Amino acid sequence: MKIALVLLSLLALTLAESNISPPVVKVYTAEPVDFGKTNEVICYVYNYHPPRLEMRLEKNGVEIPDCKQTDPSFQHNWKYYTTKSTHVHIDKGDKVECVVSHNGNPSKKYRLDIF
């Protein structure tokens, strides 16, 4: 009986791990970038499973404090999405990035494209 429970647990764990979907990340602003002015930067992370996700916004390599983050919600396909946002002053040459780590994996940086 114990062996059956162990095997069933291992099967469940294997199936859960096989459903891992890495996140898709988009970084954008609420308004077109106007250098020297404040804009809302939004990091939209979606299509990920399981819901273990860490994210932060950085400006020039320094974490931006007091960002707002939504709770993870699930889409029709049972994969998750969430956003993190803040208002930030953007000057020419600034590098604004969203740093995301999913399911304990190393962090990846996603840069805001500023034209």
Curated annotation (Swiss-Prot):
Protein's UniProt keywords contain Secreted: yes
Coiled coil residues, start to end: none
Pfam families, alphabetized: C1-set
A GO CC term attached to the entry: extracellular region
UniProt domain Ig-like C1-type: residue ranges: 22-113
Cleavable signal peptide: 1-16
SUPFAM superfamilies linked: Immunoglobulin
Location within or outside the cell: Secreted
Keywords: Immunity, Immunoglobulin domain, MHC I, Secreted, Signal
InterPro entries documented for this protein: B2Microglobulin, Ig-like_dom, Ig-like_dom_sf, Ig-like_fold, Ig_C1-set, MHC/Immunoglobulin
PROSITE patterns associated with the record: IG_LIKE (PS50835)
GO BP annotations listed: antigen processing and presentation of peptide antigen via MHC class I; immune response
Main location: secreted
Family: Belongs to the beta-2-microglobulin family.
Subunit structure: Heterodimer of an alpha chain and a beta chain. Beta-2-microglobulin is the beta-chain of major histocompatibility complex class I molecules.
Function: Component of the class I major histocompatibility complex (MHC). Involved in the presentation of peptide antigens to the immune system.
PANTHER family referenced in this protein's UniProt entry, alphabetically: BETA-2-MICROGLOBULIN (PTHR19944:SF62), MHC CLASS II-RELATED (PTHR19944)
Protein name: Beta-2-microglobulin
